[in-house]
Curated annotation (Swiss-Prot):
Transmembrane segment boundaries: none
Residue numbers marked as site, Stabilizes the basic form of H active site to accept a proton: D91
Gene Ontology terms for molecular function: peptidyl-tRNA hydrolase activity; tRNA binding
Family: Belongs to the PTH family.
HAMAP family reported for this sequence: Pept_tRNA_hydro_bact
Subcellular location: Cytoplasm
Active-site residues, record numbering mapped to chain: H19 (proton acceptor)
Site (Discriminates between blocked and unblocked aminoacyl-tRNA): N9
Signal sequence segment: none
Major place of residence: cytoplasm
Native organism: Zymomonas mobilis subsp. mobilis (strain ATCC 31821 / ZM4 / CP4)
A Pfam match: Pept_tRNA_hydro
Name of this protein: Peptidyl-tRNA hydrolase
Binding site for tRNA: Y14, F64, N66, N112
Length: 189
């Protein structure tokens, strides 16, 4: 079993924020992969399903971003899983918009949701880093991540999420390189 947590802020006013692209990714997977309906558990929303032979618990913490790790840690301990069984989908300023990279381990890189997750489960979880680009100046980061995607980005955002959905079996089977390759191939066509 694996836990795939999307990071974001709860509430409809944040739904289309760049910071919520992790929620968008797991919402897409729940819908497109016929996961169970979302229900409340572990200080968040969960949806259980299967990809290939792997059971996956999708998780959207109901806490704000800065406390995301509490829900992830609670679910991980309940299922007696290791941090290596956890994947976190999150926005990434240092990656070009709508690009996807996978990384195992590492620090928070200034991301408060990752900082909280590290505090609750350690660093050895896998991250699916969803590029949102950088506003250019550090002073503009807060407003940028809490801003909605621009209308001009909606097609690219949908393309990225669809590519993730199509390539997701590779992630479920721990073939991160093939997952990224399949996303890149699907986005070129």
């Amino acid at each position: 079993m694996q836990i795939w947590a999307g990071l974001g802020n709860p509430g409809s006013s944040y739904a289309l924020n760049r910071h919520n692209v992790g929620f968008m990714a797991v919402d897409m997977l729940a819908s497109e992969k016929s996961f169970a309906p979302w229900k409340r558990a572990f200080q968040g929303q969960v949806s259980l399903g299967q990809i290939d032979q792997e059971r996956i618990l999708l998780l959207k913490p109901a806490t704000f971003m800065n406390e995301s790790g509490r829900a992830i840690g609670e679910a991980m301990r309940f299922y007696k899983l290791a941090p290596e069984d956890v994947t976190v989908f999150h926005d990434e300023l240092d990656i070009a918009p709508m690009r996807v990279k996978v990384k195992k381990g590492g620090g928070a890189a200034g991301h408060n949701g990752l900082r909280s997750t590290i505090a609750h489960i350690g660093q050895s979880f896998r991250r699916v880093r969803l590029g949102i680009g950088h506003p250019g100046e550090k002073s503009r980061v807060h407003d940028y991540v809490l801003g909605n995607f621009a209308k001009s980005e909606t097609d690219s955002l949908a393309d990225m999420l669809n590519a993730i959905n199509q390539a997701i079996p590779w992630l479920a089977n721990d073939d991160d390189a093939r997952f990224m390759s399949e996303i890149a191939l699907r986005r070129q066509s």
